[in-house]
């Protein structure tokens, strides 16, 4: 008798998904997917169903350089919150600080660790201060892959166009240009450091096509890409202890200005000893990550517990303007069951390998690889307006992501090998994702925008 990790209340819907699977797999093998939407349809769907396009859940900023701008309520609350300490009380301690260094890096994820390595290679003494442990960051939770246009039939030009299109032509084109030109160099640098990307039998990179892309350019390490990258970066940073000092459990609570008005360091708070520390630095780099744990609009999130928008607050209190924070990125497939995993990322790689979003009646309702904002809006529409979602025992709603299609398309064992992390995570709850689909709903994923920079 077949066992299932899903409760009895979901079995009828599961049976409908199973009964329609063979036909859907045949269509997928012939590349016959649910039709893709046009750009005009994108805008219509987003305006109706995407959380960022709804007027509720926003307030106007009352202070600072962005005064009058409407932003998410949760973000407004931390930007306008009362400071924990008065920096003026600590300014004199810059003359006799607890620590002094060339470069202070606030944040210990992938960006902070990379900045520390680059600074140390340029003869700088570095202090890396992190809120939790070194490596406790969103980087370590990234799964599906990292993009770079490095195949013969691809180019940074196409990567640029895909990125601009995915951003609905509102991107900062200079930053996008930097991203797409640097990406192949960064992939090579990571590989040289020791990151083990998935490879083809001939030794070339195994690259997949993600949502909104016209070419295959997603480099992965099974479905644990961020974990693999962070493993190598963390190891490399810790092997340079002569130049990089790590202060764990020491979040920054304020930045400090020196007598010239330039940033001269920061106030840290040691969570273990409950004391404030002053770090004097010739340069300060903010690498604090996003704001997912603010749970904008009440959504679950893929983000780690330290992702509370600290860098935005630190910079805004010094008068640095905010840019492009109007929209957040929601990942279309966050776990909606079991309850212990709510919001957990279900990597895009699942859909890249062939799994399709399916409603409660076992029907396709959208192309599996639309841009993330569009895919999220389509899933919300299916659940909220069309009432075609699956209701969990706790009252949550979601759609099926039919992962068993992957083994039927690519051969038995593909799910367990290519999605090793997800396979084990769901196995703990009695769900074999090679045989049963996952229940998903959009989850807060990336912070778009941030503090304004000079270039």
What are these regions (language model features)?
Residues 2-19, 320-444:
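An anion/pyrophosphate-binding glycine-rich loop and adjacent beta-alpha core
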Residues 101-128:
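N-terminal Rossmann-like FAD-binding beta1-loop-alpha1 element of flavoenzymes
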Residues 148-179:
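Glycine-rich active-site loop/strand segments that organize a redox cofactor
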Residues 120-146, 152:
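Glycine-rich FAD pyrophosphate-binding loop
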Residues 53-74, 78-79, 191-275, 280, ...:
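Conserved redox-cofactor binding core of oxidoreductases
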Residues 1-103:
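Extreme N-terminal leader/targeting segments of oxidoreductases
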Residues 109-111, 133, 224, 291, ...:
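Residue-level detector of alpha-helix initiation sites
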Residues 283-340, 344:
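Glycine-rich loop(s) and the adjacent beta-strand/alpha-helix scaffold that form part
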């Amino acid at each position: 008798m077949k066992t299932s990790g899903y409760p009895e209340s979901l079995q009828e819907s599961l049976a409908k998904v199973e009964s329609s699977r063979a036909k859907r797999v045949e269509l997928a093998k012939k590349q016959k997917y649910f039709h893709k939407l046009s750009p005009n349809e994108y805008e219509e769907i987003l305006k109706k169903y995407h959380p960022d396009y709804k007027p509720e859940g926003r307030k106007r900023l009352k202070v600072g350089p962005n005064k009058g701008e409407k932003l998410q309520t949760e973000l407004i609350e931390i930007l306008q919150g009362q400071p924990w300490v008065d920096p003026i009380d600590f300014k004199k301690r810059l003359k006799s600080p607890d620590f002094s260094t060339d470069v202070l890096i606030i944040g210990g994820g992938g960006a902070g660790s990379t900045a520390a390595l680059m600074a140390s290679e340029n003869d700088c003494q570095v202090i890396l201060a992190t809120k939790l442990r070194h490596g406790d960051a969103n980087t370590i939770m990234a799964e599906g892959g990292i993009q770079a246009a490095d195949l013969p039939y691809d180019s940074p030009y196409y990567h640029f166009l895909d990125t601009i299109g995915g951003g609905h032509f509102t991107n900062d084109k200079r930053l996008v240009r930097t991203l797409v030109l640097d990406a192949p160099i960064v992939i090579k640098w990571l590989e040289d450091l020791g990151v083990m990307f998935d490879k083809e039998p001939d030794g070339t990179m195994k690259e997949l096509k993600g949502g909104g892309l016209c070419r295959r350019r997603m480099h992965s390490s099974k479905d644990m890409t961020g974990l693999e990258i962070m493993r190598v970066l963390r190891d490399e940073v810790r092997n340079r202890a002569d130049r990089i000092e790590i202060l764990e459990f020491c979040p920054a609570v304020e930045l400090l200005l020196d007598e010239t008005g330039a940033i001269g360091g920061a106030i840290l708070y040691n969570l273990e000893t409950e004391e404030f520390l002053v770090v004097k630095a010739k340069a300060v780099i903010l690498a604090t990550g996003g704001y997912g744990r603010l749970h904008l609009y009440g959504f679950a999130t893929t983000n780690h517990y330290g992702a509370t928008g600290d860098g935005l607050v630190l910079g805004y209190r010094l008068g640095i303007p905010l840019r492009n924070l109007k929209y957040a990125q929601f990942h279309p497939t966050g776990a909606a069951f079991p309850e212990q995993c709510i919001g957990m990322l279900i990597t895009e790689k699942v859909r890249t390998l062939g799994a399709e979003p399916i409603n409660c009646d076992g029907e396709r309702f959208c192309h599996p690889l639309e841009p993330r904002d569009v895919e999220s809006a389509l899933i919300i529409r299916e659940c909220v307006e069309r009432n075609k979602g699956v209701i969990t025992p706790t009252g949550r709603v979601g759609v099926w992501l039919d992962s068993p299609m992957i083994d039927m398309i690519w051969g038995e064992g593909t799910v367990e090998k290519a999605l090793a992390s997800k396979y084990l995570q769901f196995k703990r709850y009695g769900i074999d994702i090679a045989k049963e689909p996952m229940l998903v709903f959009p989850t807060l994923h990336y912070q778009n925008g941030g503090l304004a920079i000079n270039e």
